[in-house]
Every structure is written in C-alpha cells, then in structure tokens.
Amino acid sequence: MDWEGPGSADALSAAPARVPETQWEAAVGVLLAAVETAEPVVLACHVSPDGDALGAALACGLALRAAGGQPLVSFSPPMRLPAALSFLAGQDLLMAEDALPRRPTVAAVFDTGSVDRLGALAWLAEAARDVLVVDHHATSTRFGTINLVDPAAASTTMLTAELIDRLGVPWTADIATDLYTGLVTDTGSFKYQATSPAAHVLAARLLAAGVQHAHIARRLWDTHAFGYLHLLGDALSRARLEGPDALVWTWVDRSDLERAGLDVEEVEPIIDVVRTAEEAEVAVVCKQDADGSWRVSTRSKGRVDVGSACQRLGGGGHRLAAGFTSWTGPEETVGRFRAELAALASEAGMSE
C-alpha cells in the first residue's frame, strides 16, 4: 500500500532530522581525524548509566575500533554495570576515570544533558579540545563544541546509529546489540510515546544485523534475583496515592536493599510497576543510594510535564520520564516535587 501523511517516506526514515548538517559533518570530521592520528577518543556517559547511555557509548566505541581508532569508554565511579546490562558488547573498552588521558583531543559524551551529570568525569568538558555531545533530552544544555542533540529521537542510540553510518562503519552483531539495547530501554520496549516510525525502522535494521532480541528482552526485564521479589512486595505495600495531581509514590531505603542483597541499580524497574496504577497520572519512586542520597525516578502518563519539575530540582530528562537526586527523605522529597508540579501548572494557567 502507499503511505501518506505521518507514514510518508520522510517520516519513516530512520535518520533523525533535527540535527543541523554542519554538526554532523563536524562530528564525523573530528572523530575520523582522531582515528587517522591514532589519538585516543574518550567516550563518556552519565552517572549510573542505563541501557541507552551505555549502549550508545559502547556501540560508538566498537565502531571507532573497527575503523582503526583507540576508543576509551568510561563513566563516573563506581564503574559497575548493572546485572541486567552485563550482556552488552565492548566491555573490554571500559576504562576507569583515573586512567583516562587528562587532555584528550576528543571526548564524546552520550545521553548526558548537562556537565554535572558526568559526575567525576565533568572535567572532560573543559579538558578536551573537542567535546561531542550526543543526546536526545529536551533539557539538554548543549554543552559541547559539537552537539548532536535531537529531542525527537526516541533514544540516544538512534543518533549514535546515524553517526556510525556516517563514519562508514558496517554494523556488526555486537554494534547492533548495543544500539538495540538503548532503543528498547528508552522506548520501554516500544510502549512509550517517544516510539516513532523511525524507531521501528531502526529496530528492523538492527534485527537484520543479528540482534538476539528475545535474549535482550529476557535480560532487561524478565530476570531478577529472588530477593527482588520480596523487595518489590515491600515497596508496593507502602505505595501511596495522593493529591489532586493523582500522584502514586513509594520508596526503597538502604535496609530494603541490604536485606534483599541488591544494588540500587537493580530496583530501577519498580517505577514501571508503580506507574501502572490506573488512578495515577504521575508516579515517583525514591531509592536510597549508599551515600545516603535518594535517586528519584518520575513518570507521567501524558498530561503532566515531570521533566520540567525535575529540572527545577537539579535533575532533568524527558517530559514524561525524568529524575533528580535528593538529600531529604522520601516524604519531603515528594512534597518538593509536587510543589514544583503545582508551580508549573500555575504558571501555565497564568500564561493562557
């Protein structure tokens, strides 16, 4: 059949279209120059990286190595991959922050909306001559000398796939696995509103390149330590549904994690259970880190902009999925978050 309108050939293109061509050309230029001169290229991603951040950085690293380059992939300590991401290809490219060259010519930063999200690697933004930012967050500060930023892209790996194509590197099964992991992570296995025709076109290319999609899905969503089941039950039993904004929230503290024998990264999926409450428009899960701080994950079903509220609290992300760090307890943290939601709603009403 013929496609028209939203399903036209342009809409079905897998290449993100909102990055200026000059930025693509600059990105390819500095990366290929580094390959030709055998200079190491540092590939970094945000603290506590997820499948999109790690998938993008590792896929780019594999592509640069295939082109003859010297990629070094890193993120802020502790450099420990979540168990759910232990299958990612290219882990031999990982290098600790303190072993990185102090004045790299090129640093590429993936899925990171602001310098502070680099944590212990924030110095790269000043130390590198060329800083390439590859990101799809609407809250991105575009802190690079070159910025491949497109909030319309369903994942950072969508942009990374385009970059690898432009570098002229064929997709191996390993590269495709890392790219696909980022794509399904940030589209919620193609459930979220960010999923586009282009996302499905990219998925088809990745499957054709050798991705074992059933294995990836099983590792990402269907494999948990037994202790997770008890912890999930505890977190759900204390969930609260409150307020005119129909917000459902719960928390996981250090005692929960220690009792279950889990790391904080391993309880990220709880937000996807909490958000299913039919009565709730917004979901929040607070998870206590080893230093006493709380990682706060937020989700919206569509009406509420949680990204802007999180940005006001020092975090960021997307309109419907975002997060921030808090040093106060869960109840006070959720109260501050709700206050920001109320302020945003009031400001929106005043502007109408």
Describe the role of every protein-language-model region.
Residues 86-145:
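Active-site cofactor/cluster-binding pocket
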Residues 72, 106-108, 130-134, 146-149, ...:
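Hydrophobic/aromatic beta-strand patches that form the interior of the parallel beta-sheet core
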Residues 61, 88-94, 149-152, 301-302:
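Short, hinge-like loop/turn segments at secondary-structure boundaries
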